[in-house]
Every structure is written in structure tokens, then in C-alpha cells.
């Protein structure tokens, strides 16, 4: 599976897992939300190990840009808050950084 697909799935798993904790602690949802939340966070960690990279830190750094874009998508689609110009500019810069890390000759 290509790295970008793994990063997309990892971001979805991480944001879903973190939102489960947010829902429990900030929105007053049942503690049962933590069960799928923890499973989702475990899936996130496992997915990042599937990226073909020699160093974990480089994998995490490249993933960071994808996570930012996925988080802003979640903000808009799940929470109904439209990202502003500054959100989108920051996401573009982060994605450019991720692309440099991923595509750099090694």
C-alpha cells in the first residue's frame, strides 16, 4: 500500500480515537466511547509501522502534514466548522513539508 494511503488511514484512525476521548471528557458521552477510541488509536499506531521507512521519526514527521489536513477535514465535515484562510494556508505549508520529507533522495 502506498505511504500516502497508509497516512490517510492512520490519520482517520487517530482522529477518530482522539475524538472518542474528547466526546467522553468534553461532551459528557459514556465512558464506553473509550473502547472503540482505544482500538482506533492502536490501529493508528500499527498503521504507521507499515510505512516503508528506515527511521520512525521520519515517518512521523511526514505524517504530520497529512494529519493537519485530515484534522481540518474533520473540523469541517464532523464538527461543521469551516476552516478559514489561515487554516488552509497552514495546511498547504505542512503538506509541502511532508512532500519534501517523503520525496527527498536517500
Curated annotation (Swiss-Prot):
The chain crosses the membrane at residues 5-25, 31-51, 61-81, 85-105. It is a multi-pass membrane protein. It comes from the Bacteria. The keyword Signal does not apply. The keyword Transit peptide does not apply. Keywords: Cell inner membrane, Cell membrane, Membrane, Transmembrane, Transmembrane helix. GO terms for cellular component: plasma membrane. InterPro entries: UPF0060. It is found in: Cell inner membrane. Belongs to the UPF0060 family. This is UPF0060 membrane protein R01043. It comes from Rhizobium meliloti (strain 1021).
Amino acid at each position: 500500500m502506498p505511504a500516502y494511503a497508509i497516512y490517510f488511514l492512520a490519520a482517520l484512525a487517530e482522529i477518530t480515537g482522539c475524538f472518542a476521548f474528547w466526546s467522553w471528557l468534553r461532551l459528557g458521552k459514556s465512558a464506553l466511547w473509550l473502547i472503540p477510541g482505544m482500538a482506533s488509536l492502536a490501529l493508528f499506531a500499527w498503521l504507521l509501522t507499515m510505512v516503508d521507512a528506515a527511521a520512525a521519526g521520519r515517518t512521523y514527521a511526514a505524517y504530520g502534514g497529512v494529519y493537519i489536513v485530515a484534522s481540518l477535514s474533520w473540523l469541517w465535515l464532523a464538527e461543521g466548522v469551516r476552516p478559514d484562510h489561515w487554516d488552509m494556508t497552514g495546511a498547504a505549508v505542512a503538506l509541502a513539508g511532508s512532500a519534501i520529507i517523503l520525496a527527498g533522495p536517500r
